[in-house]
Regions:
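Conserved flavin/dinucleotide-binding core of flavoenzymes
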Residues: 4, 8, 17-18, 23-26, ...
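Active-site rim elements
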Residues: 117-128, 274-282, 357-365, 424-436, ...
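Mid-domain catalytic core of redox enzymes
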Residues: 302-419, 449
Length: 532
């Protein structure tokens, strides 16, 4: 629900209130009941035993789903070949560094001008602690990880029409919202209005918990004092010497927090998917894709654009165009095919599958997303504002500003995620702009939160996923209705072809979904082979 709309509470806003008032555990339980959260189904390395009968498998796509399939099938004894559109492994597991050149639809070319050591992840950028398959493959492939700072209490929440447009610290909004809610609950408890819900013996325990949870005083009131300051910070912090005494800051009235609607953003940290600990590969997310590719050796044929997929009772024939010889159409045959091409692309390729799978492929639209990386002369967010990692949220079209979790407290340049726009009108509006204009707008909007932007900005790159040639969108965007009707048909083996990828999972847009989908697909394919 957008600011200024009618006061109808959506499912997401209901979850936000549950999470901010009752805490992340309560929110996770609510999300699970609504089908929005679950632990990874990964149970450890897959075991494909039995006679593979010298079978061959063609894998289409060298993203994480495709490379997972290729590695596991080769280990089981299959003859494996991989065709990949790009000239690099990883698919959406992608990192841009200085010197990289990327051309999107519309022939807009961007050359990344980042300084040495700086990078930007246009696709996935974080790994939850419970995405066990991704973490296990990182361990097995020796991909070094470091913490990704999701929640930084010193980062900012911003609403253009609230507090005179001034951003507020997350800790201030969170602490004051919690304290005011605790005071209200304590008040109705002492007035006996919860007697039907709370036993007499539990009443005092509830009041004690509210006092502790909300930093209330002896009268169960939330107000500005040094006890409150221990949670929300100080107007003047404790120091040493004659001027050492701390001074508490003023609290924000509940009415102002509610009116600002900044409480909405607190759910982003309570949601199970975003709870600490989060991880990132040291040096960029593509370290995962590169590690897979090293393990695979020469299995991957890069620069291969698939133009036709045919099958009969004896096998699969795929036609493709090699970027080194674009005038010629080449073919490759195999007994089986694991296809991980995004549905947004696959729906445009002639494909010999049954009507049910074809309908499923055509039924899934892809989400629009825009991510913009901005390099600055210095890490002003650290030096001026003591923001080390984390994410700030805003109602401006850029939606998010994320601060790097690597190279903390170092001098020199730094790269921010200057915008992460997922779905909604702003995502499509930014995608329609040339990259230079996207960057200019991100700098303009960001300067309303960090005034240092315009003086410190150097260069940037802007990725609009609907204009990315190899995906034409960010990720599969299932509706509940489409999933109920088409999901099983999408995942079933059709003759000698099986699909895999984040779109064939209940974790769309996450690398975990891609890997789990792939493991499930190759396990079922292998079972069919050994039983033939």
């Amino acid at each position: 629900m957008q600011n200024g709309s009618t006061a109808i509470v959506t499912k997401r806003e209901l979850l936000a209130l549950i999470g901010t008032i009752a805490g992340s555990a309560a929110m996770y339980n609510a999300m699970t009941s609504l089908g929005l959260a679950a632990d990874s189904a990964y149970k450890g390395p897959i075991e494909l035993s039995g006679d593979v009968k010298d079978a061959s498998v063609l894998v289409l796509g060298a993203g994480l789903a495709g490379m997972t399939a290729a590695l596991e099938l080769r280990k089981a004894g299959y003859k494996v070949k991989v065709l990949e559109y790009n000239h690099r492994p990883g698919g959406r597991n992608w990192t841009l560094r200085g010197g990289d050149v990327y051309t999107e639809l519309g022939d807009f070319a961007q050359r990344c001008e980042f300084a040495e050591g700086q990078y930007f992840n246009p696709g996935p950028w974080r790994i939850p602690y419970h995405h066990r398959a991704v973490l296990d493959y990182c361990k097995r492939l020796n991909v070094a990880l470091e913490p990704f700072v999701e929640l930084n209490h010193n980062a900012l929440l911003h609403a253009s029409g609230a507090f005179g447009g001034r951003p507020q610290r997350i800790r201030d909004i969170e602490t004051d919202f919690r304290g005011n809610i605790a005071e209200l609950l304590a008040k109705v408890t002492t007035q006996g209005k919860l007697d039907e819900a709370v036993s007499t013996e539990d009443r005092e325990t509830l009041l004690a918990s509210l006092k502790s949870w909300g930093a209330l005083d002896q009268n169960y009131a939330y107000k500005a004092d040094l006890e409150t300051a221990e949670f929300r910070g100080y107007a003047k912090g404790p120091g040493g010497g004659l001027s050492a005494a701390p001074v508490a800051g003023e609290t924000i009235p509940l009415s102002e927090i509610l009116k600002s609607r900044l409480w909405r953003y607190l759910q982003n940290f309570a949601a199970h998917l975003f709870q600490t600990t989060m991880f990132q590969p040291v040096g960029g997310m593509d370290m995962i894709g590169k590690a897979f590719a090293r393990e695979m050796g020469d299995l991957i044929h890069y620069g291969a654009k698939v133009v036709n997929i045919a099958q009969d009772s004896g096998g699969v024939t795929v036609s493709y165009v090699d970027s080194k010889d674009p005038a010629a159409v080449q073919t490759v045959k195999a007994d089986w095919c694991v296809c991980t091409i995004p549905l947004s692309i696959l729906s445009q390729i002639p494909l010999n599958v049954g009507a049910q799978m074809k309908a499923a492929i055509d039924a899934v639209p892809y989400a629009s997303a825009v991510k913009i990386g901005l390099q600055f002369k210095r890490r002003f967010w650290e030096e001026d504002e003591a923001i080390y990692g984390g994410i700030s949220f805003t109602d401006l079209p850029i939606r998010q500003i994320a601060y790097p979790s690597s190279d903390l407290n170092r001098s020199g340049r730094g790269v921010l995620l200057g915008a992460y726009i997922f779905e909604g009108a702003s995502a499509y509006e930014f995608a329609a702009l040339p990259p230079a204009e996207r960057i200019a707008r991100a700098v303009d909007f960001g300067s309303r939160i960090h005034p240092q932007y315009k003086g410190e900005f150097e260069n940037g790159v802007a990725i609009a996923w609907h204009r990315v040639p190899f995906t034409l969108g960010c990720a599969g965007y299932w509706t509940d209705e489409a999933r109920a009707q088409h999901y099983d048909d999408l995942c079933q083996i059709d003759g000698r072809i099986v699909l895999a990828g984040e779109h064939a999972s209940y974790l769309p847009a996450w690398q975990e979904g891609a890997i789990l989908s792939s493991l499930d697909a190759v396990a079922r394919l292998h079972e069919r082979v050994v039983k033939m």
